[in-house]
Amino acid sequence: MTGSPHKVTRRQLLRLAGVSGLGLTGLGYLAGCGGAEDATSTTAATASGSKDDLPPVRIGYIPITDATPLLIAHAQGYFAEEGLEAEQPALIRSWSALAEAFQAGTFNLTHLLIPIPIYLRYARGFPVKVVAWNHMNNSALTVRDDGPIRSSADLGGRQIAVPYWYSMHNVILQMVLRSHGLQPVIQDQKAALAADQTNLLVMSPPDMPTALSTGAIDGYIVAEPFNAAGELLAGGRIVRFTGDVWQNHPCCVAVMHGDDVTARRAWSQKAVNALVRAERWSRENKEEAARILSKDGAGYLPFPENVIARAMIKYDLETYGVDGGTGAIRHPEWRSSRIAFEPYQFRSATKRIVQELKQTVLEGDTSFLKDLSPEHVADDLMVYGLVKTSLGQWGGLAAFDGAYKDYERTEVIEV
């Protein structure tokens, strides 16, 4: 079940979704329709159809390797083997557009940066559910190789792009900035910037390497393969891997509409089964996964195989270590991978993310975070039963990265 992804333009996407006129920041348009209860019924009407069938799996994705399980499950026919029809995945360029389309029911299974469903559910009342982690790690901070920035300590007075305000990239970057005594700010790029300030701006991942090479920005933090593309195609230098700051952190998660999870439990379980199987296969076959994803293979990602293979595999001290490398790896004892695969949503990570979001500079109204309980988010947003059932079929936690022995872990963060 391979083939080029169906590329949806912004105008086509909004027309399909029935939400023409929304701004790019309009994640929460459904809030104006009456909160979570009304949002649930809207989802049921637009995305779910009848309650007792097995609808086609409709996947939207950003062209990053975070989407690997969704795309490999489609390419390898894992959805079909679960008895589900899967439409050709649709490539979307920006997180705003993808989140809008998911809310509107254009897609019933997608990946989102884990802070986005937190925002959707608790700021906007949209009934999203996180059914699995898509991966761990897989992001980095990239700067110009011929520029003055040699480490994250040199980011003062600089313009750094993030893919989205509600992203692990923004959260981890600001943790790093604070550790160096730098203040993250959000302001116009033309405004004066103090030496101890770093200006953050949102940019779609596909635009980042070009912006770096032309000098429009000083650096970016984003998912792969845009860091590998920056290295190979845009004169970039990786100065820190996010997985070397927060060991095996989640980033993108697989999400469904809450109505589907409750009313279509069999469909939801089958879809998660396919994702977990794809994660295990991808962990054990990274070179082949890179080929399939690349434009030299099934064409899901608009990059040649060598770029995606580098993004998934290259993680050596000679290139990235402190002694003689770029310094992107400072904790080799963690034995991390550039991308790791483990589908279970550890409660400790969810709780720490909520805690960190409360300290992160974000654009827009963040009042919902003030009284948001990390424990409540871990209980309410995550659906654990589906992935636990799937893990039972595919070797348990021991068959995945981290080789965790049970469903609890301690978060390790060392900036």
Q: What is the predicted function of each stretch?
A:
Residues 2, 16-17, 209-240, 313-318, ...:
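Extended low-complexity acidic/polar segments
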